[in-house]
Amino acid sequence: DVVAINKYMGWYHPWPVEPKDAIWEVVTDKPLIISEFGGEALYGQSGDENVVSSWSEEYQARLYRDNIRMFDNIPNLRGVSPWILFDFRSPFRFHPTNQDGWNRKGLISDQGMRKKAWYLMRDYYMKKRNN
């Protein structure tokens, strides 16, 4: 058995504390997997990494960096899976400028272009593989 959770820290709600200071109390001895995390960005859109509403690659990359910092504080963490690899069509995404019928949480755009957060996750997984 494993425990899997979806947690969108920094996207749907702000961080309650600095990511590096987030303490997780895991009350089970089972392996824990973060089965979904991330946030949306339009490929090629630049903006302030501190402004969630910018939908920028810089904000998405910061969000991933923050989550990676938090992962170090999670007991029993055995794996993480960003939501999602590619941007995809979604009929329930109504923001006319940034979504227009697309879920933009992908690490890769719908045209196959790698967003800045893709490189962060590649480096994260490479580091984990080598440890």
Over which residues does each language-model region extend?
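Substrate-binding/catalytic cleft of secreted carbohydrate-active enzymes
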Residues: D1-K127
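Short, solvent-exposed mixed-charge patches
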Residues: N130-N131
